[in-house]
């Protein structure tokens, strides 16, 4: 549904951005929290879906669905990378070739509608080595996205870099407070507990949304 006269931010991404059903609490995507840091007059439509890559999101018709609704002055926030590195043919893209080809479809599609695309690098996974150093698990995808954003003159928000800095500052133990690390029996959805280093809890999702909002301000995006 298009809401005439209301500026809208559409979110296209994976599980780190997606909304979750109440029974999955406390796991949260940061897209569920971004409304806390932008003007109330701006509408957020979160179309991010767990497990999707820049390729599979398009192949399933999800970008087309957004482009049927988006209008001049709206924004399309695009965050993929976690699943683009998967080996299955449905999702895999190569960071310096097909990844760019699919991301350009988001860029070109939004611009054709008079809307503004924004590229957002995939969130850093919380993986520390035995020496307490953070491990890069995304390979070239974040750098590749930044290069494409520069080439296409698209605003770029480096949430990979920002979240990595935060994890390094907090360290191995304290950074768990942002992720879905739960004891057995703590929540019905996770009876055996969980140690998830990719997906954030409510506190972490809100912190990431704050990072995104800070970047929006620094980029002087015309939101609100």
Residue ranges and their predicted role:
Residues 19, 29, 42, 55, ...:
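Sparse, context-dependent recognition of short Cys/His-centered cofactor- or disulfide-binding micro-motifs
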């Amino acid at each position: 549904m298009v809401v005439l006269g209301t500026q809208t931010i559409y979110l296209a991404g994976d599980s780190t951005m997606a909304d979750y059903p109440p029974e999955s609490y406390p796991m949260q995507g940061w897209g569920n929290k971004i409304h806390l840091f932008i003007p109330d007059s701006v509408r957020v439509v979160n179309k991010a879906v767990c497990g999707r890559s820049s390729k599979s999101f398009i192949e399933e018709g999800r970008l087309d669905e957004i482009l049927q609704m988006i209008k001049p002055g709206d924004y399309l926030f695009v965050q993929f990378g976690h699943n683009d590195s998967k080996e299955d043919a449905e999702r895999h893209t190569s960071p310096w070739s097909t990844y760019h080809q699919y991301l350009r479809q988001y860029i070109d599609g939004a611009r054709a509608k008079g809307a503004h695309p924004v590229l957002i690098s995939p969130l850093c996974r919380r993986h520390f080595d035995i020496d307490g150093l953070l491990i890069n698990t995304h390979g070239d995808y974040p750098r590749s996205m930044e290069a494409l954003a520069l080439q296409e003159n698209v605003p770029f928000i480096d949430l990979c870099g920002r979240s990595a800095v935060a994890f390094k500052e907090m360290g191995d133990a304290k950074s768990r407070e942002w992720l879905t690390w739960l004891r057995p029996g703590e929540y019905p959805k996770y009876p055996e507990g969980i140690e998830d280093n990719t997906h954030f809890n409510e506190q972490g999702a809100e912190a990431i949304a704050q990072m995104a909002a800070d970047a929006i301000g620094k980029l002087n995006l015309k939101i609100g």
